[in-house]
Amino acid sequence: MNIPKDPVMLVSFLNLKLRDQYASLNALCDDLELNPEEITQKTASIDYHYKPEYNQFL
């Protein structure tokens, strides 16, 4: 799946998917065939980190 390359847009995309469709980052990555380590590196570049207790990047 094509996902946004811009980190800000990526966080918005991920949080929307996590809120509406997926119970966890791993479920999202498994379904969309994404590497969770790559995702978290990209979001960390703008100081957003996955918080499992909220199921969001904050």
What are these regions (language model features)?
Residues 35-48:
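Short acidic, Pro/Gly- and aromatic-enriched capping/linker segments at domain boundaries
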Residues 28-29:
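Short alpha-helical "recognition helix" segments of helix-turn-helix
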Residues 1-20, 24:
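N-terminal acidic leader/helix
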